[in-house]
Amino acid sequence: MTRRRVGAAEIRRANRGWWDTDADDYQAEHGAFLGDLDFVWCPEGLREADAGLLGEVAGRRILELGCGAAAAARWLAAQGARPVALDLSAGMLRHAAEAAGRTGVRVPLVQADALALPFADAAFDTVCTAFGAIPFVDDSAAAMREVARVLRPGGRWVFSVTHPMRWIFLDDPGEGGLTAVHSYFDRSPYVEQDEHGVASYVEQHRTLGDRIRELVGAGFRLLDLVEPEWPAGHEGIWGQWSPLRGRLFPGTAIFVAEKPAR
């Protein structure tokens, strides 16, 4: 692992390849926690059924970005919404199709880049993602503008990401992850690379201020910033997320924003 600058083409190639290759392992490790028909915002286990961050969903046209296996989109369909699930990875969309067969809940699946959404202006009432797309694109401000374009005036944009303060720590769920070792202001991405030094996984860091400026710059109004607390009785570990760290500082930030009505 290293922290270094990576070009846009290399980022796209790396992350598409990573999620295609890792899709089976990811679902094997996390599929039970995420469910086939559920909307889980984060490793802390906050569910949309309890949080209600999207507001009313019945009858709404909802786009799920970076949908993975599209459990959230299927849950939305079960609540009466009209969702579309989008992901860059064919491997993850294969799992989405398989889960649709298991549950009998089918939603449109689209393979596309979050920086070039294949939809008309104002096509959706709501756009959402749980840890999808935004941390993995080269230009997340441009992704915000694309979301604003496809969202109708008055529509809501809700997304969760790793809490920016987590980037000062090592990616370690244990004691080693309690000591600050990185500058919060170093925006160099987290990069995993092969033996030839070619990036195989890239994740971007932005500060809280960066995220707010991206939203405002795209024309959004921030309604809420949710930092889910680690729930009592939750002893699961997901990558760097753990009870030890979760009880001390936040691991997830959920931004709730609105495109102002004209």
What does each model-identified segment do?
Residues 60-116:
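Class I SAM-dependent methyltransferase SAM/SAH-binding core
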Residues 161-169, 195-210:
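Acceptor-substrate binding/catalytic loop of class I
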Residues 125-140:
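A short SAM/SAH-binding and catalytic strip from SAM-dependent methyltransferases
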Residues 202-225:
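Short alpha-helix
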Residues 141-156:
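A short glycine-rich, Lys/Arg-flanked "PGG" loop and its adjoining helix->strand segment in the class I
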Residues 1-58, 71, 92, 156-191, 249:
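Conserved class I S-adenosyl-L-methionine
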Residues 115-126:
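A short acidic, Gly/Pro-enriched loop at the edge of an enzyme's catalytic core
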